[in-house]
Amino acid sequence: RDFLFANRSNYPVAHRDFRWPDLEHFNYALDWFDAELARNHGSQLALKITGAGEAERTFAQLSEASNRVANGLRALGVKRGERILLMLGNVVPLWEVMLAAMKLGAVVIPATTLLTPTDLKDRFDRGRVRHLIATAADAPKFDGLDPTVTRIAVGDAPAGWHNYDDLLKGAPSFTPDGPTRATDP
């Protein structure tokens, strides 16, 4: 990055001499979001949601909330490499879960709220989904799908589902199980 900034007005040199870093380990949520953005710009606005569900979060708030969610997900059995189907609109939990999953080394399968039960069955089967996070209103779309999948609802959790708000009760600091290899999914 510094090389590109220093050569931003000299395109031939920037193009010829730039080399991507060859990292052995890298975790965006831990190594960039928390270590750089939250630490150095914690009070600055990181997220602004307008319209229904209007909300704002700073880098520090998202960092801590994602730590809590990561700890809560870990307590529910989410492990490195497992897949989480995430079906939420543009709401704060979407961003908290994205960062939390990265911290855990879990793989997020994003899903639009427009998917039908048939579409979701396909995602479950091909994606090898182990965990699911969706709104309580969308919970009926998952009826009849793999009952062993951990189900977490944003809103009033139906029977058999965990409540997302309980994840936010996790510890405010997070320690990863180990390093994330730069080649990990």
Where are these regions (language model features)?
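N-lobe entry segment of adenylate-forming
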Residues: R1-R57, Q61-R74, T148
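Conserved ATP-dependent adenylate/AMP-binding module captured primarily in the ANL superfamily
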Residues: E82, T113-L145
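Conserved AMP-binding/adenylate-forming core of the ANL superfamily
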Residues: S43-L99, T116-K121, D165-D166
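Short hydrophobic alpha-helices that are characteristic scaffold elements of the AMP-binding
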Residues: L99-L104, R126
